[in-house]
Amino acid sequence: MAALRYRRFLKLCEEWPVDETKRGRDLGAYLRQRVAQAFREGENTQIAEPEACDQMYESLARLHSNYYKHKYPRPRDTSFSGLSVEEYKLILSTDTLEEFQEMNKSMWKKLQEKFAPTRPEEKHKAWTRVLSRPRT
């Protein structure tokens, strides 16, 4: 029975798309990682809670098949903000979020990152130079 569960999860992982614009935050990539952890021994893995495993699979399968999208249809493909799905994908991409984080940095933080040494030994040398200067 564990082999059947393993094959079902593998099939779901194959069908689940991976969004390359969401590096490190994609549900498809996370799902593949969790299945690999849960089924370390492949088809020979012993499942401690088979009911919970089946329930998890059914929940993921409903999400993948857009069960709730069909059950609760929306009149338009927009949200309260009026943005389309493509616009949301652009905004939520990792590159755009990194740009927003860079924009939100203060001028002082940007200058620190630009001129601060990157290696720990360089930081130590910079501090010893500053501390060894005579104060006037």
Swiss-Prot record:
Described purpose of this protein according to its UniProt entry: Required for the assembly of the ubiquinol-cytochrome c reductase complex (mitochondrial respiratory chain complex III or cytochrome b-c1 complex). Plays a role in the modulation of respiratory chain activities such as oxygen consumption and ATP production and via its modulation of the respiratory chain activity can regulate skeletal muscle differentiation and insulin secretion by pancreatic beta-cells. Involved in cytochrome b translation and/or stability.
GO cellular component assignments: mitochondrial inner membrane; mitochondrial intermembrane space; mitochondrial matrix; mitochondrial nucleoid; mitochondrion; nuclear body
Compartmental location: Mitochondrion matrix, Mitochondrion nucleoid; Mitochondrion; Mitochondrion intermembrane space; Mitochondrion matrix
Keyword terms: Membrane, Mitochondrion, Mitochondrion inner membrane, Mitochondrion nucleoid, Transit peptide
Transit peptide: 1-13
Entry protein name: Ubiquinol-cytochrome c reductase complex assembly factor 2
Subunit field text: Interacts with UQCC1. Forms a complex, named COMB/coordinator of mitochondrial CYTB biogenesis, composed of UQCC1, UQCC2, UQCC4, UQCC5 and UQCC6; stabilizes nascent cytochrome b/MT-CYB and promotes its membrane insertion. Forms a complex, named COMA, composed of UQCC1, UQCC2 and UQCC4; activates MT-CYB translation. Forms a complex, named COMC, composed of UQCC1, UQCC2; UQCC3 and UQCC4; mediates MT-CYB hemylation and association with the first nuclear-encoded CIII subunit UQCRQ.
UniProt note on tissues of expression: Widely expressed with highest levels in brain, liver, kidney, heart, skeletal muscle, thymus, testis and pancreas (at protein level).
A GO BP annotation: regulation of insulin secretion
InterPro entries per the UniProt record, alphabetical: UQCC2
Species assigned in the record: Mus musculus (Mouse)
Record-linked Pfam families: UQCC2_CBP6
